[in-house]
Regions:
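N-terminal hydrophobic or amphipathic helices and topogenic motifs
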Residues: 2-3, 10, 24-63, 248-262, ...
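Bacterial N-terminal signal peptides
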Residues: 9-21
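Short, glycine-/small- and polar/acidic-enriched structural segments
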Residues: 28-34, 42-126
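Bilobed "Venus flytrap"/periplasmic-binding protein-like clamshell domains
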Residues: 29-57, 115-180
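Structured segments of extracytoplasmic/periplasmic soluble domains
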Residues: 49-57, 76, 80, 84, ...
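Conserved beta-strand termini and adjacent loop/short-helix elements that scaffold enzyme active sites
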Residues: 65-67, 139-141, 168, 219-221
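Pocket-lining segment of extracytoplasmic ligand-binding domains
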Residues: 89-92, 119-120, 146-258
């Protein structure tokens, strides 16, 4: 009798262990790692809101990761360092991405052309002219979404092939070069025409506006060729739009009469489907629904 009770007890423990093991394998990861953007920026706020709604439904913990922007986010997403990220739509199709992912359109972003007060190139399109391109370089921040757009535009319109980007480590350094109209590279002076910045309308970062607000102006982008760039589904990546006078974050404008002509594009929330690996059907359904609801209930407010 004693042996029978022991046998039953052992069987019960084995059964409980198997049940626990199956449950553990089916449970989602303990963390949801969300790659966003700079500290205090719009990407960080959006990621915190979306991620909070997802983890609240799943019952795990949100880990917000601050990054340098779209390029770094795409890299981290592919490497598995983050599970979900906010990335510019043109970076989604030009940067290496995970084998399987879901992308949802989020908010609209504006392409700002920023140039020095008193500068010659108040319109990005002027850099098509070889005589202008030979005199000036573009300032850009390494790894930023703006660097992706700049390179994509140069590839889209071969007339910009002579334009040279000069990379800076951050927006403050790039803004400083734009404000003074030049930078020194290996002891050689390089004149800077300006730089692109991409973000939510009216939300230029303090790195650009705080110390250099009186030295940098918002210019225009007048070139129809960029409307020809397409995404993987054949849809336009960039659409014509304007920057109203109250959306320059306090910077002066080259066009004092009407909105600044430029392009807009979408940011996307990108989810790595590898997050679902190892989950059973019920848990997969739960996580997918939480992700979809977390994204859509948030971005509908900011679209």
């Amino acid at each position: 009798m004693k042996r029978t009770l022991q046998h039953i007890a052992v069987q019960g423990m084995l059964f409980a262990s198997l049940v626990f093991s199956a449950f553990a394998q089916a449970a989602p990861p303990t963390n949801l790692k969300f790659c966003t953007g700079g500290v205090g920026g719009f990407y960080e706020g959006l990621g915190t809101s979306i991620g909070g709604k997802i983890t609240n439904d799943i019952g795990n913990t949100l880990k917000v990761i601050n990054t340098g922007g779209s390029v770094e986010n795409a890299k981290r997403l592919k490497q598995g360092d983050c599970d979900i990220a906010i990335i510019q739509s043109d970076a989604v199709i030009t940067q290496p991405m995970p084998a399987s992912f879901k992308a949802v359109n989020a908010h609209e972003e504006v392409v700002y052309w920023l140039y020095p007060k008193g500068g010659e190139v108040d319109d990005f399109g002027d850099m098509e002219d070889d005589s202008v391109a030979k005199k000036y370089a573009f300032a850009t921040v390494k790894g930023s979404g703006a660097s992706v757009t700049l390179n994509n535009w140069i590839k889209t319109d071969k007339d910009y092939a002579g334009a040279v980007p000069v990379e800076f480590k951050d927006w403050y350094s790039a803004a400083e070069a734009v404000a003074q109209g030049f930078t020194m590279d290996s002891g050689v002076r390089v004149d800077i025409a300006g730089m692109l910045y991409i973000g939510r309308a009216g939300m230029l970062p303090a790195d650009i506006t705080s110390d250099f607000g009186g030295q940098i102006l918002v210019g225009e982008v007048n070139d129809d060729s960029f409307a020809n760039a397409k995404d993987a589904n054949g849809n336009p990546l960039y659409t014509h739009c304007g920057i109203p006078k109250d959306k320059t974050s306090g910077l002066g404008r080259s066009n004092s009469i009407s909105d600044q002509a430029t392009y807009c594009l979408r940011a996307q929330v990108v989810f790595n489907n590898a997050y679902l690996n190892g989950l059973d059907e019920a848990e997969t359904t739960l996580v997918r629904r939480a992700v979809d609801k977390g994204i859509n209930s948030t971005v509908k407010v900011v679209r």
